[in-house]
């Protein structure tokens, strides 16, 4: 991770005063509201991103559980939604997508493809999964290669290639063109206003990971319509 801080071991602490956060000040959503977004010890402001992550996580979990109930699919989507949130906030701030996240998603995506009890429309078999992973990585790699040849500088990063590969492992090769299309449309929608008011230029660095995530979410939300269209 960017700060080389374990998210598994150790307790949370305030980045301003380095004091450990008490358990009753670490309750998702409630603590942020009760403390009025300030550290109890040093009164430093607590970034709103923590509240946003907790809120989106809670809403995602409720929505996923509503759709799938007590099933292995629910657990898989819990893992995916947490990973998506981590990717979005890290890529937006640091312009990187941690290998720890993408490699874990690739491993889970491939291993779950051997489970015949999972919905085959949602999760592909291992052959489809393997092809999806390869196609996802190859497409971004080709884009990077061509852009560098034409512009003589880096465009997208290999982190994006690994992320699209992971999504291919999860949802198969058929998902790749839809995810790329949706993510490109969303990215264009966000980038155009900045380009028009000249706060960004065509050479500005733009993290594409969050748009791949949003593209994947749109693909999943529209999956039923996509299947009907393809059939």
Question: At which residue positions do the language-model features occur?
Answer:
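Transmembrane helix-loop-helix
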Residues: 64-76
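Juxtamembrane boundary at the C-terminal end of a transmembrane helix
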Residues: 221-231
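C-terminal ends of transmembrane helices
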Residues: 1, 36-44, 84-96, 141-153, ...
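Select subsegments of transmembrane alpha-helices in polytopic membrane proteins
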Residues: 48-55, 101
């Amino acid at each position: 991770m960017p700060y080389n801080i374990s998210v598994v071991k150790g307790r949370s602490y305030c980045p301003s005063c380095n004091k450990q956060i008490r358990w009753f000040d670490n309750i998702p959503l409630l603590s942020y509201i009760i403390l009025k977004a300030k550290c109890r010890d040093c009164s430093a402001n607590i970034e709103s991103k923590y509240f946003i992550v907790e809120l989106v996580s809670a809403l995602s979990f409720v929505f996923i559980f509503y759709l799938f109930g007590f099933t292995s699919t629910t657990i898989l989507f819990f893992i995916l939604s947490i990973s998506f949130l981590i990717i979005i906030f890290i890529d937006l701030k640091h312009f990187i997508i941690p290998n720890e996240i993408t490699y874990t998603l690739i491993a889970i995506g491939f291993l779950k493809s051997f489970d015949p009890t999972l919905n085959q429309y949602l999760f592909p078999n291992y052959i489809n999964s393997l092809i999806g992973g390869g196609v996802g990585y190859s497409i971004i790699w080709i884009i990077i290669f061509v852009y560098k040849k034409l512009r003589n500088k880096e465009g997208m990063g290999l982190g994006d290639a690994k992320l699209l590969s992971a999504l291919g492992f999860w949802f198969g090769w058929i998902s790749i063109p839809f995810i790329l299309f949706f993510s490109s449309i969303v990215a264009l929608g966000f980038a155009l206003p900045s380009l028009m008011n000249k706060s960004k230029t065509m050479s500005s660095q733009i993290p594409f990971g969050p748009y791949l995530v949003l593209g994947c979410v749109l693909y999943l939300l529209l999956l039923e319509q996509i299947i009907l269209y393809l059939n």
